[in-house]
Structures are given as C-alpha cells and as structure tokens.
C-alpha cells in the first residue's frame, strides 16, 4: 500500500515542486546520529530552496511518501530494519516489514505518487567483482524503466564506474552532467569518464525532461552532479581505501545486499570520517540541485 503524506499530496496536486528522498541512507548508509541529522538537514535544504521534501520509506508494510520527523527518527535508530529494493516491496507489504527504500524502490514509489524529481547520494551499479559475482544493482534496471529524474553524484565510488556507465548506455538511460562533462565519481568529482551531454542550468534540464515526457520515453534521466569541490577527496587515497575494503569484505565473506553498507562503513572508519563528511555534503548538494530542477519543471506548468 502506498500512503502519501497530506502535505506532499497537496503539493503534487497544486503543482508545487517536490523532491523525493530515499531512506537506505538513513537505515544502512550512515551511523546514528549522523543519519538522523543528515536526513533532517537534507529536508531543510529542500525547503529553503523553495521545494517540498518527500522522504520515502516503509513502515509496517506501508510505503510512506513523505515521512514525518518521528518516522525518520524511528528509521534512524530501530534495529533489524530491512534494505528494501524494488523486488522486496511486495514482500515488505505482505509481511508488514519496516526498512529503508533503495534507489530503485524510491524511484517506483516516487513515480506512483506523481513526483518527478528524486535526489540521492549515489546510485548502485556494477560491482567491481561482477565477472565472478554477477552483482549488478537493481537501480540500473529501474533507471531503464521508470521515467523520473534522478539527481546523484554518479555511482558510488566502490563500484566499477566504466561498466556502470556502459550498462546505463545499454539500457538507454540518458546521463546528463550538471555543470560537468564527466561522470561524477561520488567521493571524488572527476572520474575521467566523459559524458556525451551536459547542461549548465536547471532550465535546460527541465526542457530535456519535458521533451522526454512528450516523446513518451519511459526511462529515467540521470543527472550527474559532482560533490562540492571543497569536500571532494583525493582519488588515490580513496582508491587505496576501497581496495582494502574490498579485500576485507572477501575475508569476511560479505555478499549481496550487505556489501555496500559494509564497504561504506569501512571507508568511513578508516578515513577518520572523511568519506562520511563528503557523503553528507554531496547528498545536500544533490538535494539543492534537485530542488532547482523541480522548480524549473513546475514553473512551466503554472
């Protein structure tokens, strides 16, 4: 069941700009209390930018679009919460589970609710050991079939970025750089992977979104927004940490859904919190840019 908060429903119906937010960053992406503070601060960024935030999560089997502060607090602290991807939504509903929604599940809920723009930190993608594990995130399949706009700082740096970009190409997903001509690399802004298309204003992007909708192309538009320059980390240092984290994951036999949370936690601890600080900064930055895009989209409808 999908339940839209009254203030979010009113915003959608009156053509106010709305920005969706995921909740696995709360349940599995950051430690407490950084997860709670970040979730509330990101919502505040969107409000101050003139848009309406709609954090999405699952509580007792109900897909909630527009979590209350009390519900966000619950997801930030509760134990045994599930990481809920698109394929898990029906099970979560049937078994009355609670948990954070991944990019794919949040995209689905956003689209069903009528929200056009979704901001996240980084998407999932092709894992570096995919040749052996076949570990490819459902996020990529969702991007290839759900027509909303996703603002991110690229794919998480722990992934195989060239393979992820190639997979998106295969799925026919338009990747647009926002004030960049390279696919962002999450912790460090420049991956060296050139993008075919880029824009410099929210208005340009809004026009592309409108044309996509007019043509009825049922695929997402992925907006690559680099982390703030002052918060971007040095590539060599990050890559060393990632290699060590991947080795530790193998030693600990970490697999499937547990891989990404394990790696992010390892990086945060072994970078003395630097990766966590960058993660927080880029999520806020993406929320701000998402708000500008949502406002540009709605401006043409009023």
From Swiss-Prot:
It is an enzyme of class 4 (lyase). Its EC number is 4.2.1.70. The keyword Aminoacyl-tRNA synthetase does not apply. GO terms for biological process: nucleobase catabolic process. One of its GO terms (cellular component) is cytoplasm. Binds 1 Mn(2+) ion per subunit. GO terms for molecular function: hydrolase activity, acting on glycosyl bonds; metal ion binding; pseudouridylate synthase activity. Substrate binds at residues 83, 103, 137-139. Keywords: Glycosidase, Hydrolase, Lyase, Manganese, Metal-binding. The keyword Metal-binding applies. Catalyzes the reversible cleavage of pseudouridine 5'-phosphate (PsiMP) to ribose 5-phosphate and uracil. Functions biologically in the cleavage direction, as part of a pseudouridine degradation pathway. This is Pseudouridine-5'-phosphate glycosidase. It comes from Coprothermobacter proteolyticus (strain ATCC 35245 / DSM 5265 / OCM 4 / BT). The gene is psuG.
